[in-house]
UniProtKB/Swiss-Prot annotation:
Residues exposed to the Cytoplasmic side: 1-12, 85-89, 225-236
UniProt entry keywords in alphabetical sequence: Adaptive immunity, Cell membrane, Disulfide bond, Immunity, Lipid-binding, Membrane, Transmembrane, Transmembrane helix
Keyword Isomerase attached: no
Domain of life (superkingdom): Eukaryota
Membrane topology according to the record: Multi-pass membrane protein
Chief place of localization: membrane
InterPro entries on file: Tetraspanin/Peripherin (IPR018499), Tetraspanin_animals (IPR000301), Tetraspanin_CS (IPR018503), Tetraspanin_EC2_sf (IPR008952)
Protein family membership: Belongs to the tetraspanin (TM4SF) family.
The record's account of how the chain is modified after translation: Not glycosylated. Likely constitutively palmitoylated at low levels. Protein palmitoylation is up-regulated upon coligation of BCR and CD9-C2R-CD81 complexes in lipid rafts.
The protein, known as: CD81 antigen
Disulphide linkage map: 156-190, 157-175
UniProt organism field: Chlorocebus aethiops (Green monkey)
Gene it is expressed from: CD81
Lineage, highest ranks first: Eukaryota, Metazoa, Chordata, Craniata, Vertebrata
Extracellular side: 34-63, 113-201
Length: 236
C-alpha cells in the first residue's frame, strides 16, 4: 500500500530535492573539471623549476571535488529511486550516504578554512625562487621560462617583496612581451595577482559547498520522515 496525504507530498518533495542534489553534483563535477583544465591554473601549476614541480595542493583539492561531484550524482539518483519506490532499505542507505558525505564536507570545509592561504603562499614562494634564479643567473633558462609564464599568464610584472629586483626583471625582458617599460612598471605585482586568482576560485567553491550542505540537511530530515511514513502505512 502506497503512502497517502502529507507523506505523499514529502515523497515527491524528497524526489525534487534529490533531483536538485543530483544536478548540484553534476555542477560541482563540471566546475571541478573546469578548474582542473583552466588555462591560468594549468599554465602555472604544471611548471617545473629544475627538479622541483609547482605546488600541487590546489590540484589535490580539485581531485577531491571531482570525486565528491561523482558521488553526489550517485547518491542523488539513489535518493530519487528510493523515494519513488518507497523503499525503506534504499532510503536508509541514502540517509547513511548523506551522513557520511556531510561529515566529509564539514571536515573538508575545516581543512579548507585552515589552509585557505597556504595554496597561494606556496605558489608565491615558488614564483619568488624562480624570479631570484632568473635574475641572479643569466644561464638559468628554466627559471626565466617559469617567470615569463607567470608574467604572461597573470599579466603582472615583478613582486613588491622583491622590489630590488624590478630593474633587473625589466632589463632581462622577463615582463609580458609587447608592453613598454612604463606599462610594465604600472602592472600589478605578481603576488597580488596570485592571491586574486586563487581567492576567487576558493570563494566559488565555498558558495557551492554551503548550498549543498543546506540541501543535504533538508534531505536527511525528509528521508527519515518518509521512512517513518512508509513504515506506518504498511501497518494499516
Amino acid at each position: 500500500m502506497g503512502v497517502e496525504g502529507c507523506t505523499k507530498c514529502i515523497k515527491y518533495l524528497l524526489f525534487v530535492f534529490n533531483f536538485v542534489f543530483w544536478l548540484a553534483g553534476g555542477v560541482i563535477l563540471g566546475v571541478a573539471l573546469w578548474l582542473r583544465h583552466d588555462p591560468q591554473t594549468t599554465n602555472l601549476l604544471y611548471l617545473e623549476l629544475g627538479d622541483k614541480p609547482a605546488p600541487n595542493t590546489f590540484y589535490v583539492g580539485i581531485y577531491i571535488l571531482i570525486a565528491v561531484g561523482a558521488v553526489m550524482m550517485f547518491v542523488g539518483f539513489l535518493g530519487c529511486y528510493g523515494a519513488i519506490q518507497e523503499s525503506q532499505c534504499l532510503l536508509g542507505t541514502f540517509f547513511t550516504c548523506l551522513v557520511i558525505l556531510f561529515a566529509c564536507e564539514v571536515a573538508a570545509g575545516i581543512w579548507g578554512f585552515v589552509n585557505k592561504d597556504q595554496i597561494a603562499k606556496d605558489v608565491k614562494q615558488f614564483y619568488d625562487q624562480a624570479l631570484q634564479q632568473a635574475v641572479v643567473d643569466d644561464d638559468a633558462n628554466n627559471a626565466k621560462a617559469v617567470v615569463k609564464t607567470f608574467h604572461e599568464t597573470l599579466d603582472c610584472c615583478g613582486s613588491s617583496t622583491l622590489a630590488a629586483l624590478t630593474t633587473s626583471v625589466l632589463k632581462n625582458n622577463l615582463c609580458p612581451s609587447g608592453s613598454n617599460i612604463i606599462s610594465n612598471l604600472l602592472k600589478k605585482d605578481c603576488h597580488q595577482k596570485i592571491d586574486e586568482l586563487f581567492s576567487g576560485k576558493l570563494y566559488l567553491i565555498g558558495i557551492a559547498a554551503i548550498v549543498v550542505a543546506v540541501i543535504m540537511i533538508f534531505e536527511m530530515i525528509l528521508s527519515m520522515v518518509l521512512c517513518c511514513g512508509i513504515r506506518n502505512s504498511s501497518v494499516y
